[in-house]
Amino acid sequence: MPRPKKCRQLSSCVPCSLFKPNGIPAANLSQILLAADEFEALELGDVQRLSQLEAAAQMGISRQTFGYLLASARQKVATAITQGLVLKLPTPNDKDPI
């Protein structure tokens, strides 16, 4: 039985709710959901350029968990861009199980 997930400390505000290819209605496209903790990992690791150790400490998780979140987020973003899918971003109204 897996251990329960730790609460993550999230501070990033999402500027919009989704990204999609131009000129195609979102209803006609498949979606990829980026979780709130994955979005935070991208923000801390790639935008703020923190080390994995610093970013993990800021989120209140282990460095290894941060690495998994960052890899998952990068894979989802790359898939959405290369395959022309909708990338749905977390909003404050979303129910996040974390």
Swiss-Prot record:
* InterPro entries, sorted: UPF0251 (IPR002852), WH-like_DNA-bd_sf (IPR036388)
- One short Pfam name that applies is DUF134
What superkingdom does the record give? Bacteria
Q: Which PANTHER family does the protein's record reference?
A: PTHR37478, UPF0251 PROTEIN TK0562
Give the protein family: Belongs to the UPF0251 family.
What is the protein named? UPF0251 protein SO_0727
